[in-house]
């Protein structure tokens, strides 16, 4: 077995012929470009593309498989240039009963082994979604109902960015996932933490103790791929092996979660848009404004059922790592210079010594990169849709 890097949440902005898929994502973010970016610049071995249920994207996948650069695996997934395994996924917004009798919405990332499976899923979901061609459209079914449809087409379901204020289970639907999935709760074996939380925070909720945590980028542009990712131990790169790693089966497992310090996330703390301030509070804000975004940290403080975090013994480490583009002094030209010399971001973040980096970009920037990848940079909390800020290490 060997170690690989996986980012299981990447969007598509446009189809190959320019049809809109994810309106808020970059036009350059199409199926082929994602595969190329992961192979040539990021060094990501497994990527989950979560807009593959769009008929426009299905057409692109069929063309992609005819190029000679890619092929489907028996164990699931598409291999690109023998470097990257692409998992075919779909992000689905479900309709839930929210808190205090209000309607809630939650996002789920669903993955399928083969093109025929996601085709079947797409066709069935078109009866539950008004416009199946677009990404993450609201469905008229709940997560409880969705998981049965996903399994019908040999797929898996992972609740996405579970604490995000607007479109997540804990964020605006429920205090307990078990209340949503009921007797099907054990079919959920992994959850996605999201950019504003980490293992320390999530493990304050008892029902998550037996769930695998995944950290993904939720990328809306090519540079944002792998801003969060996972290190896995697998026998090969395929859908089947990823599922085993998520289930901790046969020696396969998640070795580490690499993610932002939650303070850098856009929704870490509560934010009042009326007075444009990030508020540190454990209780709902009452300032007279109806434009208050309740933060992930503050939500967890309200719903946690443990006074101190306690992770199970098999929980992998969560390693704070700042993406190159967030690091002070590292602009586009510097990144291009680094990639020209060292090929991929994973090489820069995991394999190179400080001396190697210093030889290319100088002492100050090299020191910042090393401090960032070791979690030694100071950060200022984000909130209300604004990212936190990275400050240079003293």
Question: Where on the chain are the PLM-derived regions?
Answer:
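An N-terminally biased module of ancient metal coordination in phosphate/nucleic-acid-related enzymes
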Residues: 1-103, 368, 372, 376-378, ...
